[in-house]
Amino acid sequence: MNILKLTPSCKDYLWGGSRLRSDFGIKSDLNPLAEAWVLSCHPDGPSYLADGTTLADYVTAHPGCLGTDCEKFEQFPILTKFIDAKNNLSIQVHPSNEYALKNEHQYGKTEMWYVLDCEPGAFLYYGFDHEISKAEFEERIKNNTLTEVLNAVPVHKGDCFFIPAGTLHAICKGIVIAEVQQNSNVTYRVYDTAVWGRTASPAPCTWRRRWT
């Protein structure tokens, strides 16, 4: 079996920083450098081999490179990223396989985070602190109090978090994460708190889709 050296696809989302380049050796001219998709067959950000072939095309041409059990998967099953959150991400949720296949024509997203590093006092949002109704959810978005009913979880270097599809969550500022997730790019943004560093409007929130 050959060892494949991959070049990641990188993303310059507004909340990103520079630590993926300075601390983790990711080569990219993007500024900010928010994400590096280091193992990816997803069309929104494929990994590349040295000759310019995408990992997806290589796997299609050499299916045996994944071993004997890969035939049970319709597509490459995972996507691995490095994430540098210099600022807060949107509060968001990812759909289940059932919902995403029906409405987005791709798989949903369950993911896992490993905290590579973080600033003192860093935290993330992970789920509600109590069960809320649709009416309360809508009202708290309108009056900017949604974070009052979310679990704010302190994080430390080496922590690991499992985020099942359907869990409201957000990576907050000062955290660098390795993320292993399903091979999907479906995200419903629920709540944007700010836009950083550029003249721009927040991405349109798509939470209503999840409640219909």
Give the role of each language-model region.
Residues 1-132, 193-212:
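Transition-metal
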Residues 99-100, 121-126, 132-137, 163-164, ...:
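Short, well-ordered, mixed-charge alpha-helical segments that flank or form enzyme active sites
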Residues 111-113, 170-194:
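A short hydrophobic beta-strand segment most commonly corresponding to one strand
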Residues 91, 154-173, 182:
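Conserved metal-binding segment of the jelly-roll/cupin
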Residues 22, 81, 135, 144-151, ...:
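Flexible, active-site-adjacent loop/turn segments at secondary-structure boundaries
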Residues 132-162:
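Active-site glycine-rich loop that binds ribose-phosphate moieties when present
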